[in-house]
UniProtKB/Swiss-Prot annotation:
Assembly and interaction partners: Component of the cytochrome c oxidase (complex IV, CIV), a multisubunit enzyme composed of 14 subunits. The complex is composed of a catalytic core of 3 subunits MT-CO1, MT-CO2 and MT-CO3, encoded in the mitochondrial DNA, and 11 supernumerary subunits COX4I, COX5A, COX5B, COX6A, COX6B, COX6C, COX7A, COX7B, COX7C, COX8 and NDUFA4, which are encoded in the nuclear genome.
Function according to Swiss-Prot or TrEMBL: Component of the cytochrome c oxidase, the last enzyme in the mitochondrial electron transport chain which drives oxidative phosphorylation. The respiratory chain contains 3 multisubunit complexes succinate dehydrogenase (complex II, CII), ubiquinol-cytochrome c oxidoreductase (cytochrome b-c1 complex, complex III, CIII) and cytochrome c oxidase (complex IV, CIV), that cooperate to transfer electrons derived from NADH and succinate to molecular oxygen, creating an electrochemical gradient over the inner membrane that drives transmembrane transport and the ATP synthase.
Pathway this chain belongs to: Energy metabolism; oxidative phosphorylation
Signal peptide span: none
Residues with N6-succinyllysine modification: 28
Ranges of the Mitochondrial matrix topological domain: 1-66
CDD domains: Cyt_c_Oxidase_IV (cd00922)
Name of protein: Cytochrome c oxidase subunit 4 isoform 1, mitochondrial
The entry's keywords: Acetylation, Membrane, Mitochondrion, Mitochondrion inner membrane, Phosphoprotein, Transmembrane, Transmembrane helix
N6-acetyllysine modification, residue list: 21, 28, 35
Species annotation: Perodicticus potto edwarsi
GO cellular component, one term: mitochondrial inner membrane
InterPro entries tied to this protein: Cyt_c_oxidase_su4 (IPR013288), Cyt_c_oxidase_su4_fam (IPR004203), Cyt_c_oxidase_su4_sf (IPR036639)
GO biological process: mitochondrial electron transport, cytochrome c to oxygen
Length: 137
């Protein structure tokens, strides 16, 4: 069992109770005037009656919020903090780059693999032309 409550939601367009629970004297008079023909009501009175029943219109409910700015800002804060940690790790935690990453070493290693004819059917050596001493085109 739940008590009737007011909520502005698009998927629940007609809340259980009115937005304004305690009417002022002018609002009570307007509610009495509402019982007659609506053509006698002015546009301002119709809006006032709407605001007694509902807090927001559908256009106001659908209006975007600025929450995305907070989400993007928080994400950027965490990304920046992570970048600082990575920079600190590269500088103080990791050692120097191994000599096997040196371009001369890679060239020597490639030459040795070609001399040994590594994987000659479909792999590395299959893409090398041994007569012209260059990569196949």
């Amino acid at each position: 069992y739940a008590l009737p409550s007011y909520v502005d939601r698009r998927d629940y367009p007609l809340p259980d109770v009115a937005h304004v629970k305690h009417l002022s004297a002018s609002q009570k008079a307007l509610k009495e005037k509402e019982k007659a023909s609506w053509s006698n009501l002015s546009m301002d009175e119709k809006v006032e009656l709407y605001r007694i029943q509902f807090k927001e219109s559908f256009a106001e409910m659908n209006r975007g919020t600025n929450e995305w700015k907070t989400v993007v800002g928080t994400a950027m804060l965490f990304i920046g903090f992570t970048a600082l940690i990575v920079i600190w790790e590269k500088r103080y935690v990791y050692g120097p780059i191994p000599h096997t990453f040196d371009p001369d070493w890679v060239a020597k290693q490639t030459k040795k693999m070609l001399d040994m004819k590594v994987n000659p059917i479909q792999g590395f050596a299959a893409k090398w032309d041994y007569e012209k001493q260059e990569w196949k085109k």
